[in-house]
Amino acid sequence: MNITLSWRHGRRRGLAALFSAAALVAGSVVATAAPAQAADESITVNFSVAGGSPTYRASGWIYGMTENGANPPDNYFTDVKFRYMRAGGAQLDSPGGWVSGKYDRRWNATRAQLLRTQSLGGQFVLLVHDLWGADGYPISRFPGDNGNWADYDAFLTRLIDDVRATGAPAQGNTVQWDLWNEPNITLFWNRPQSQYFEMWKRAYQRIRAAFPSHLIVGPSFAGVPSTGGWWTQYLDYVKANNVVPDIVSWHSLPGDPVANVATANTTLDSRGIAHARPYQINEYGASNEQNPADGAWYIARLERAGADGLRANWAGGSNLHNDLANLLTHNSSGQYQPKGEWWVYRFYGSQTGQIASVTPSSNYDAFATKTSGTAKILLGGGRTTGNIAVNLQRLDTTSGIVQNNQVRVLVERIPYNNGGAVTGPVTVSNTVATLSGNSTTINLPHTAVDDTFTITLLPPGGSTPSPSPSPSPSSTPSPSPDSSPTPPVGGACSATIETTNSWPGGFQSTVTVRAGSAPVDGWTVKWTWPSGQSISSLWNGTQSVSGSSVTVRNADYNGSIAAGSSTTFGFTANGSAATPTATCTSP
């Protein structure tokens, strides 16, 4: 799919509402002015003002998981404290979906991604319109054409039954229902507004009756809240008809979540519409804002606004269903590699304890946390370059960091690398600072507008933290014949462990599970660690541990292996690298 939209010119994060088709339209163009240059600014972090614990509200994506739900590997999700996946089979069999008689493939992909999201501890946001087929292609019909709702009712019956068959109970917030994406633009809703309102009411009532505790999301508006026009017309309708969504949503492409939330509060409060749950900005980050600096800025602003965020996805075709919404890339061998912005989310995912207060500047904001023995600051920008003075105040209110009026300051830069793979943050400085009045100032030379910085505070005598590195490029584990050890006979299976990367105190391994001369339907792999190793993260399987013994069973999506073929799962582990002998059994 290759549709180019016309966008309003403006600087990044201009507050005007912009039309969007993120995640669903490849080749969209955002025209922006060049970023400002050399604007020295300062921000302040006050550690005496502490908020709650981080909830990683910005760690969600729209699409970014393979069609079968198998990839990317688990660690790329768990390392960033993944919270949300928003999907519904867009672009599969295009034109596809219910209206084209091709619902099944889109539903099968949605089901696989839903189950994988839940296995990773995330919340799945179901895009109903994509399953219908309204993903940017001209389609033959919309719900309620010519006053006939029979076809849409049949579609909802099928979808409700399919969701129920996944095991999602009527009670329990296991699925969020996003009824229609960007209904205020003709790319996705090419019918009168009144017909959309009737569709909303019918879908809302059907889903509420079938799943009383599932949350309904909307309107997923193409733009940001405003005090008039389509936004307020929608609010007036849902209020008058008692079909107010559980979670109010919009898109920030670009936009400022803090300003958007203030406007949303004004428009909902004036109508007496309760909004007890956080707003959901379920597409944020225009295509030219997907870099470490802008990504970190959106994280800081979402946290400041108290809104949940799902990062937009500007890929198309098969790339839409992969690469964690463009946070990852592939090398020539098809192995996953993280981009610079993935490292931003990884640092964000490592921030624990209590949230500290930050006073932003006009172009920079930050997210800061403190816990015993460390404090961390993720800096966001993306609009200008120049020196950034980060004023750290009331360090006496931290725990286990300041010793003899000194603190160690580790500054790292996360490079954009023109959107290519990034092996990790780059150390800028690692020094011991002497405090003055329980404070110190760190000056950051911001010369590349798309790069960003992190600051880690440690006790002065402490060593530089060395978290387990991200797994080196990891292969796509899909069942395929290869030239590994001779397969076993009959319906049996074999398993081979291979160390693919190692570092001080840890390693990564891939386990190949191979069927014999007959297909395998379900497998279990077991081994025993020789010297105290332990798994820190595992993907494409489900593990259980008893002492040094490890048992891994297949995931829902990779238990069936054709005769003579194989699948893989992988893990990272603590301890010295080891390749114990593994056994495989099949029911």
Where do the model's predicted regions map?
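Aromatic/acidic polysaccharide-binding cleft in carbohydrate-active enzymes
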Residues: 289-376, 380-382
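C-terminal beta-sandwich/jelly-roll accessory domains of carbohydrate-active enzymes
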Residues: 383-473, 531-535, 542-551, 558-561
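Substrate-binding cleft and catalytic face of glycoside hydrolase catalytic domains
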Residues: 80-245, 249-256
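Extracellular low-complexity, O-glycosylation-prone Ser/Thr/Pro/Gly-rich "stalks"
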Residues: 450-451, 458-587
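Secretory targeting and sorting signals
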Residues: 2-38
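Glycoside hydrolase catalytic-domain groove-lining segments
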Residues: 246-292, 350
